[in-house]
């Protein structure tokens, strides 16, 4: 049967009290964004759920996209029918025949907001159940843990019947927690951190440092394409490319090898903070995991964080690498993340970086440089572009150019 609409149930929104309306409106806006190329769809957000009227749009495509909208707890494709027992029985049978397999158990679950309807919930459960028993062989009822639940909702305008309860990804609607910047590399961790930030309702913009001619066009394209994968969850993400070669060259030329990485990261954080302030963000997110590499020891974090009072949030800080990889595979970023295109974090990496850098030394070495001039020139060279779901940037020409190197 062709579904006519989808009933969307909210996740944590039920705990948000007086702000509930704002959260529901944001979720509705986010759902509209991911379905905007299906113009026939109508949206009706309500206090307890959202109705999406398909108007002929394919449910399979809608289903694929709703699975990636934060703030949805569950949803069910449904069929809207007239309020007659004959229509209810006929539609219930057709839905059950599509999904029932011998040996399965079932339950009819009726809810009624129209209390003037001629049958109460128990009567309708029994009538529909008896009708299904008469028309489907080997059908068994199970009240506690059935394999199939046929849900019937009697509302003022019509009856809605569904036979599936699909799970969303939960979390909070993106945008309800405010705006922040994400320091996106081309690796495994920062895309996962981006996903987790969005899941908590944060509207993120990607900040990516690139260092031509030391980094290739393909490395930049990889970061953009990772952003395109993550844009599936929100409809669009702004990508901010920051030129970083002059800063890296200057640090390498003038500072001791052991502190190259520490001072480089201090510059990155200062630039991210400038961009955050300029674009109205409230926090900085990154993909650091405690102790994973030299720059991510607690001592390194102290020496690097010193340059800002802005909250620096690390969603994967306490996760094992295997946990991060599993989540990267689940969200679809892993295969691209492991492509071997060197980014600016790897090309200037010293062979023996300090794992326990001293804050006073980091400040002393950084003070030898024209910090403000270097930062301002990098800020003058930033480029901002919107990236949409699944946009491709690693094209054949880039691959050919890479082969010639």
UniProtKB/Swiss-Prot annotation:
Pathway assigned in UniProt: Cofactor biosynthesis; thiamine diphosphate biosynthesis
Entry superkingdom: Bacteria
Gene Ontology terms for molecular function: ATP binding; CCA tRNA nucleotidyltransferase activity; tRNA binding; tRNA-uracil-4 sulfurtransferase activity
SMART domains: THUMP (SM00981)
Reaction it catalyzes: [ThiI sulfur-carrier protein]-S-sulfanyl-L-cysteine + a uridine in tRNA + 2 reduced [2Fe-2S]-[ferredoxin] + ATP + H(+) = [ThiI sulfur-carrier protein]-L-cysteine + a 4-thiouridine in tRNA + 2 oxidized [2Fe-2S]-[ferredoxin] + AMP + diphosphate; [ThiS sulfur-carrier protein]-C-terminal Gly-Gly-AMP + S-sulfanyl-L-cysteinyl-[cysteine desulfurase] + AH2 = [ThiS sulfur-carrier protein]-C-terminal-Gly-aminoethanethioate + L-cysteinyl-[cysteine desulfurase] + A + AMP + 2 H(+)
Residues engaged in binding ATP: 183-184, 208-209, 265, 287, 296
PROSITE patterns: THUMP
This enzyme's EC code(s): 2.8.1.4
Keywords: ATP-binding, Cytoplasm, Nucleotide-binding, RNA-binding, Thiamine biosynthesis, Transferase, tRNA-binding
Domain THUMP, chain residue ranges per copy: 60-165
A biological-process GO annotation: thiazole biosynthetic process
Family matches, as Pfam families: ThiI (PF02568), ThiI_fer (PF22025), THUMP (PF02926)
Compartments where located: Cytoplasm
Gene Ontology CC: cytosol
InterPro entries hit by this protein: Rossmann-like_a/b/a_fold, ThiI_AANH, ThiI_fer, ThiI_N, THUMP_dom, THUMP_ThiI, tRNA_STrfase, tRNA_sulfurtransferase_ThiI
NCBIfam families with a match to the protein in the record: tRNA uracil 4-sulfurtransferase ThiI
PANTHER family: TRNA SULFURTRANSFERASE
Function as written in the Swiss-Prot or TrEMBL entry: Catalyzes the ATP-dependent transfer of a sulfur to tRNA to produce 4-thiouridine in position 8 of tRNAs, which functions as a near-UV photosensor. Also catalyzes the transfer of sulfur to the sulfur carrier protein ThiS, forming ThiS-thiocarboxylate. This is a step in the synthesis of thiazole, in the thiamine biosynthesis pathway. The sulfur is donated as persulfide by IscS.
Family of the protein in this entry: Belongs to the ThiI family.
Protein name according to UniProt: Probable tRNA sulfurtransferase
Source organism: Lactobacillus helveticus (strain DPC 4571)
